[in-house]
Regions:
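Intrinsically disordered, low-complexity regulatory segments
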Residues: 1-143, 152, 214-215, 219, ...
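Basic, low-complexity terminal or inter-domain segments flanking catalytic cores
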Residues: 2-8, 19, 154, 187, ...
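Conserved short loop/turn motifs at secondary-structure junctions
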Residues: 5, 85-86, 162-166, 247-256, ...
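Alpha-helical scaffold elements adjacent to nucleotide-binding pockets in ATP/GTP-utilizing enzyme cores
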Residues: 19-23, 69, 92-100, 120-124, ...
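C-terminal or mid-to-C-terminal helical accessory/interaction module adjacent to the motor/catalytic core
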Residues: 116-198, 248
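Core structural elements
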Residues: 142-152, 170, 200-202, 250-262, ...
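Metal- or metallocofactor-binding catalytic centers and their adjacent structured scaffolds
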Residues: 220-256, 443
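Short acidic, hydrophobic short linear motifs in intrinsically disordered regions
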Residues: 242-245, 254-267, 294-303, 459-471
Length: 783
């Protein structure tokens, strides 16, 4: 039993609670809310538009025990500190906790931590503040906006395209960016151009180099082979000479420390992590991980930020670490980076909480992903405070008549920050020339040969997850806290598909985008969406009322909905079949993707003349708990669905439980749920996690099936599935036989039978409710 005078501190997750509890001592009891406890229920719109857009919040289903536990703890506590994350979402969680626990205004103590370290936690507890209602209102405005758009637009898509689709205020714009880029690629007309290189030798001295054609003497583009040939004709048999040598020093400055968007981009480039995975691992590093001899330690600062600000203490610590580890030459003075226009400066940039915790010192305490991301954050921050990298650059100009060729080479003079870190790039890096001989102006040269190459201009590259994050940031679409969820959502909805790290729209995505462009130009407008983000920022700053933002938005949106319903009254849009690369084994046509009530499959487009079909491998949400690869849905020969790692026998993971798009709030691994009737809410299947749910508590008793260890090959899985089917058939037959006698008795009792028949409509209600739940619209950013 906690001491009656203990203070209660409420955070979101158990790992954060554990870390903070270590720093506060026995006078404080730290509990976790496990995220949101109160929200708009999914079953209805839950926004009273007629009464000033009043939200109708309710406690979340499945959180009753947590709420009861927090209420019990609150009754016997001293002060109650609400210590959720330092952003809009965290402020809203605290606001809902205040309501659920019935905490008076004058007894509300809100505390935030930019980093979870002893000094920061203890200092914050000593200086609590009231809940910032402006932050809460900005979150409410965003939540209600997304609910209205999602719940009113999605049913229109169901009626006009297909069931189960969704639209959202930000996800629709992100989809548009991908579709627009694809249209640019399709419309692109390649332009021919040529390059001409010459291999030059020094006259009477060792040393040669390659130079590139520049012009005659002004810069000239070679657009055809005829252009190249005219240059070659002019050069034939003529001498070359060095007309210019320029030597200079070039410096490169380090990139600033990470903000949310740049962390997601760099983790995608260097670590091959999705934005969603990056944020999940970063959350673990922020909230605390077990470090040998230290207990639970928060390793990085808060990871949802667009600020480049760094505290003076952190700057000093970085300088000390650089001087001691790399030497005084690698550190000159603190670098203070200017914030971008429109950036919110409430938090610092993303950095290590304690730079003295070198990545290699904590590697054995972290998972592979945690270590790689921590090392990336640590290296980027330290590099941001190091001296410039210096290069010696030599540029040579050689001429033959009026035709000029150039060659450039750079060599490193001082490594500076590049000793530990260099920023990744989305585009291909330029090929560097070979070292150049020590030439002097006027020196004679001879041409040893020419190399002409034909090229064509390339279309704009498809977005990667990293470059889409950058585009959303540059255009003002979404906020740092939403990028990862939005990019995951448009892929989960199958509006966008990722192939070889490149994002392209699906046929479905293009049809939905076309309808949105035609009927909802504001919702799909990049400028409109960016302006809405600015209005939410104004609400946060206390410059606008949140309900006035909703009212202004809804007036135009409602009219667009009315117009769209009328214009599309007799319209049904068809989604073209996705054409696969696989060929029909009978007639040779490219198979197309079809959907039945059992899921997707490949079929010949020549139906009914050709009836060839083939099962398709479906990619599931989440990641393999053993190796982190994708999880695929497979079927046995008897049609039973099971889920296995895409690496097959190389990994060996297999389960009958269904992967979900939810991650465990404690360990971060993918959560699963039982298939079929009797399934409970998603559970954690990681036996090393404190949130692990044992086999016997996962919803219903399962028959004996192939275990994960025994299922390293598909044949094992199929054999188990067939055995399970046989058991099911035997059980079904037994039930049927057992039901005969009661059925005969019921037939003999006609009045009783009538009474049962009269109750049938009532019996259908749960089924109707279940069916309705399957077609609920979804918000832009569901919790």
């Amino acid at each position: 039993m906690p001491n009656a005078k203990q203070n209660l501190v409420i955070v979101e997750s158990p790992s954060k609670a554990k870390t903070i509890g270590k720093y506060l001592g026995p006078d404080y009891q730290v509990k976790a809310s496990m995220g949101h406890l109160r929200d708009l229920p999914k079953s209805t719109l839950s926004v009273d538009i007629e009464h000033d857009f009043e939200p109708e919040y309710q406690p979340l289903k499945g959180k009753e025990d947590i709420i009861a536990d927090l209420r019990k703890a609150a009754k016997g506590s001293g002060r109650i500190y609400l210590a959720t994350d330092p952003d809009r979402e965290g402020e809203a969680i605290s606001w809902h906790l205040k309501y659920l626990l019935n905490i008076p205004d004058n007894e509300t103590y809100r505390v935030t931590f930019n980093e979870i370290t002893r000094n920061v936690v203890q200092e914050s507890i000593q200086h609590p503040r009231p809940i910032d209602q402006n932050l809460v209102d900005a979150q409410q405005a965003r939540r209600v906006l997304d609910r209205i758009v999602g719940y009113q637009l999605s049913p229109l898509l169901w009626k006009k395209i297909r069931k189960g689709l969704s639209a959202g205020r930000v996800q629709s714009v992100a989809t548009r960016l991908v579709v627009d880029r694809e249209n640019e690629i399709r419309a692109f007309v390649p332009q021919e151009y040529w390059t001409l290189d010459v291999n030059l030798n020094r006259a009477g001295k060792p040393g040669s180099f390659t130079a590139h054609y520049y012009g005659d003497p002004q810069k000239r583009e070679l657009t055809s082979e005829q252009d190249v040939q005219s240059v070659l004709d002019a050069l034939e048999g003529q001498p070359f000479s060095v007309t210019g040598v320029k030597r200079s020093e070039k410096k490169r400055t380090p990139a600033p420390p990470f903000i949310t968007s740049t962390l997601q981009q760099e983790a995608s480039r260097k670590l091959n992590m999705t934005p969603r995975r990056t944020m999940m691992i970063a959350q673990q590093l922020y909230e605390g991980v077990e470090i040998s001899g230290e207990g639970s330690v928060g390793l990085i600062t808060y990871m949802r930020t667009d600020s480049l600000r760094i505290s003076e203490e952190a700057l000093a610590a970085a300088g000390d670490a650089i001087r001691s580890r790399y030497g005084a030459a690698y550190y000159a003075e603190p670098r203070r980076y200017k914030p971008k226009s429109g950036a919110q400066d409430a938090h610092e940039a993303i950095r290590p909480s304690n730079v003295a915790l070198y990545p290699e010192a904590v590697e054995h305490d972290l998972t592979k992903e945690q270590y790689r991301l921590y090392k990336l954050i640590w290296s980027r921050f330290i590099a941001s405070q190091m001296t410039n990298a210096l290069y010696d650059v030599t540029a040579i100009e050689a001429a033959c008549g009026s035709h000029v060729f150039r060659a450039t080479h750079q060599s490193m003079k001082f490594s500076g920050f590049t000793a530990i870190y260099e920023e990744g790039r989305d585009d291909e890096q330029e090929k560097l020339d070979s070292p150049l001989p020590d030439l002097a102006p006027g020196e004679a040269l001879t041409a040893a040969g020419f190399d002409k190459q034909q090229h064509f201009t390339q279309p704009p590259a498809r977005y990667t997850e990293a470059s889409l994050v950058r585009a959303m940031e540059e255009k003002g679409v979404g906020r740092p806290s939403t990028y990862a969820a939005i990019i995951a959502t448009i892929q989960d909805r199958e509006y966008v598909i990722k192939t070889d790290k490149k994002l392209s729209p699906t046929k479905l995505g293009e049809v939905v985008n076309g309808l949105m462009m035609d009927r909802f130009p504001n919702i799909i407008s990049v400028e409109f969406t960016a302006d809405m983000e600015k209005q939410l920022d104004q609400v946060e700053a206390g410059q606008r009322r949140w309900k006035s933002v909703l009212e202004e938005f809804y007036t135009g949106f409602h009219q667009e909905m009315v117009d769209a319903e009328e214009a599309l009254k007799d319209t049904r849009l068809k989604v073209p079949d996705e054409v696969s690369d696989e060929k029909c084994e009978i007639c040779g046509r490219n198979l197309v993707v079809k959907t039945s009530r059992f899921g997707k499959f490949l079929a010949c487009p020549g139906y009914p003349d050709c009836k060839f079909t083939k099962p398709i491998t479906e990619k599931m949400p989440g990641r393999c708990p053993k190796c982190g690869s994708a999880i695929l849905k497979r079927k046995s020969k008897r049609g039973y669905a099971y889920y296995a790692c895409e690496r097959g026998a190389a990994c060996g993971f297999m389960t009958w439980d269904v992967p979900t798009d939810q991650d465990c709030p404690v360990c971060g691994q993918t959560m699963f749920k039982r298939s079929g009737k009797g399934a409970m809410k998603p559970f954690c299947a990681n036996p090393e996690c404190s949130n692990f749910l044992p086999e016997d508590k996962r919803g219903y008793r399962r028959k004996s099936t192939a275990s994960g260890e025994a299922a390293t090959a598909e044949s094992n899985a199929e054999a188990a599935a067939e055995a399970a089917q046989k058991q099911a058939e035997e059980k079904k037959a037994a039930k049927k036989a057992a039901a005969k006698k009661p059925a005969e008795k019921a037939a003999a009792k006609k009045p009783a039978a009538k009474k049962t028949a009269a109750k049938k409509p009532a019996a259908k209600k749960p089924a109707a409710k279940k069916a309705a739940k399957k077609t609920e619209p979804e918000d832009d950013l569901p919790f």
